[in-house]
Amino acid sequence: MLNPDPQSCLSAWDEVTSPNILVLGDLMLDRYSWGTVERISPEAPIPVLRLVREEERLGGAGNVVMNLKTLGCKVTVSGLIGKDSIGNQILDILSKEGFDNSGVQQVSDYPTVLKHRMIAGHNHLLRLDHDPPAGYQYLNYSNLLSWLDSILPSQQALVISDYNKGTLHPSLIKSTIQIANSLDIPVLVDPRNLGDYEIYKGCSWIKPNRKEAGAATGISIRDQETALKAAGILQQKLNGAIIALSLDKDGLLLFQSSEEFIFFGTEALEVFDVVGAGDMVISILSMLVSSGATPSIAAHWAQLGAAMEIQHVGVVSFEREEIRKRFVYGHTSTKIVSLKRLQQELALKDESPVVITNGYFDKLSSTHLKFLGQLRKFKGFTVVAINSDASIQRKKGEPPLLDEMERARLLASLQSVDRVLIFEEDNCCEVFRCLKPKIVVKGARYQHRQIEESQVIEEIGACVEFLPEYSL
């Protein structure tokens, strides 16, 4: 079976509107403690994390919910949380993000799941888990099932995100799948269950990882042959469900039958963090499947999204246009970001100063390269902000020689440049206000000229450095 052609992939992606997708699963709270390590504790041979900031996000099935919202889907969330402070925080986040909480039930005998990660730079130092007791099963699910029965007719897909925390009783899963089947709604399952997959019978898709598929089939998945064997056994157990088997470093296997399968490889890029990759796969699959895309096209985009996810520390949700640009322009586009994305990214970084320069960067030449090559002397995180095509047209009265994405890609290919962003305004004032750089770099001629953004530079307390090679 051949990989889908690029034009078909793009057409399917661009045809997606805002499908209604219901996510049923184990809702958790992810807490991140970000800091720096500068010494070893005198009490024990362990690093001392100096706390810089903390952040709380939706985790587990909640991560799928946030992925789908960021992708532009209309998302309905359902699950079980405890009547505790962690559960209340989940409800607060859902409300702030604009979700209806009517499908989320709070119960007194369940401790809401918390995953507390402690991180220095790109290194996870420790994860502290707050889990329910082993073997916990929530039995009083009749009200939740009634709610699911009432809401499913308005949905275009159902995602079951089962982290095996006891909130999804096997009978609840079976009944919900039966209701969805009666309505011809595709059901996509992300299982953490290492045992009985019979409870998922009737699902349209299932997305196990290597470990989960191995445990469910008794096969040690070492290569493509054993992966195909395991996928075939799973499909028999699940009455013909499509298998999207995540093979970590080896990519993704799409298995429709023993004659119809594709291995999607991974790009040879640096992996920072695998957390959230599986959730990204099920999110993109559900969006495209609910929109009528073919299995091969849906899996192709899902694997691309996972490749983007593992290049970030912590869980990241991507907008649809970000993933599209990665497809069109390749992996160099990971350096090309929106202002919103860059703000989020900088909030999670260490205390390295932000160093920024801006300009048209049209008609790129060796003098530009010399100028940009010297940005590293400031020992910070370097950002190049470029005027959009429309901005240049307004300011110069003519379009640039190179369009904005060509300019951005060329700049992103330079080792001295960490990120590139394109701004629509006529000046860089808003970018400076949002990013609050420590250093603004200009060409030498600006030592004797008025800098357009000088007032903002003064407001944010940045210093201006001048480089001699080129004036922007």
Residue map of PLM features:
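Short, flexible loop segments at boundaries between secondary-structure elements
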Residues: 53-56, 184-198, 460-472
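Short internal beta-strands
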Residues: 76-81, 187-191, 208, 383-387, ...
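Conserved phosphate/ATP/ADP-binding segment of small-molecule kinases
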Residues: 166-261
